[in-house]
Amino acid sequence: PEQAVQQASTEPDSQQAAAEAQAAVTEEKRKAYEQATAALDAYLKAQSQKYQDPARHCSLDFTCPLPSVGRISTYFGEPDAVYNKPHTGADMPAASGTLIYAVADGVVSAASARPSYGNCVQIDHGTADDGSSYATLYAHMSSFCVSAGQTVHKGDVIGYVGNTGDVRGANGGYHLHLELRINGTRTDPLQYIPH
């Protein structure tokens, strides 16, 4: 009986230790995620500046980036299940290899593999009549078929749906992660882009 009491009293301690260890791992992952995000943002900003042309006009006449979108699995701003950070784009589930289209005319400012976004493409669409610059980012592609500096037109195929990079949780399957940046700031893409 005394041994059973002693064993029962140590169970909460071991549960607390396990919870603390899990919290430490989660915090470490969160910090790594934030560092990777900062590095990605710096890279994308530098690439955008490299290919930015103030004379390029963005008409804001966007098209859907996929042949069809059945649903949105994660919306812009929803808390991330792992890091509890706001989601930076909209996730559109689709079959592996589904064509991904440029939503508008522009110049590819980045086409590379990144740790968090996997194979991704950023397109700078230019400046709209309101003076704001627009860019879109397409992530987790299985592969892309454009290169930095390439001019693309609305509806051109730029890559294929995949699940590369840091995909997890409910969004761990094949999907397009789509971001819209206005003057470099992430904005809800579904406010501008048909789906």
Residue spans for each PLM region:
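Histidine-centered divalent metal-coordination motifs
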Residues: 87-89, 140, 175-179
